[in-house]
Amino acid sequence: LGDVYKRQLYYHERYADAVRVFEAFLDGGRGWIENNIEACRHLSWCRYAMKEPREGLSALLRTLEYDTPRAEVCCDVGKHFLDRARYREAIFWYELALSRERDDRSGAFVSPDCYGYLPCIQLCVCHDRLGERARAAEYNDRAGKYKPDDPSYLRNKLYFAAQGS
C-alpha cells in the first residue's frame, strides 16, 4: 500500500488499521531507510493514540534497526520520558537530538525544530522540573535564539526573570 494511504489511516484516526498496515510494511523489509524510519514514527503515534505507550516506545526504538537516530526520533523518545516525569531519561534524548546533524539533502522527513528549538525548550522544562533553574534558563535562552517570538520562550523568560534566574 502507498505511503499516502498508510498516513491517511493515521490522520483519520483509524489507528488499529494503520498499525496493521505500518507493521506489514516494516515486516516486508523492502522499504527505503527513510520510509522505514518514518513508518516507525507513525506506528508509534498510533500506539500512543491507542493508549499503548510501551508499544509506542518500541516502535520508536525500532528505528535503530535502520540507522542512527534522527533528531526527530530523539525528540519523540524524549517526549515519551518527559510525559512520564522521567526527566533524566528525557534529558538524555533531548541532548542527543541537539547533537544530531540535520541533512536536508538525505531525502529524510526533516522537522527543523527537532534540531534546535524543540530539544532546547524541552530541556528547559526538564531541568526546571528537577529544580535546576539556572540550567533551565540557559536552555530557554538557547530556544529563544531559534524562535525569539515564540510564546513558550517568552513566557519562560518572564518566569525565570520573576525567579531571579
Per-range role (PLM):
Residues 34-38, 72, 113, 118, ...:
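Start-of-helix register in tetratricopeptide repeats
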Residues 15-16, 53, 87, 133:
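TPR-repeat structural position
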Residues 42, 76-79, 122, 156:
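"A position-specific structural signal for the A-helix of alpha-solenoid helical repeats
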Residues 1-5:
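Short, small-residue-biased leader/transition segments that mark boundaries at the very start
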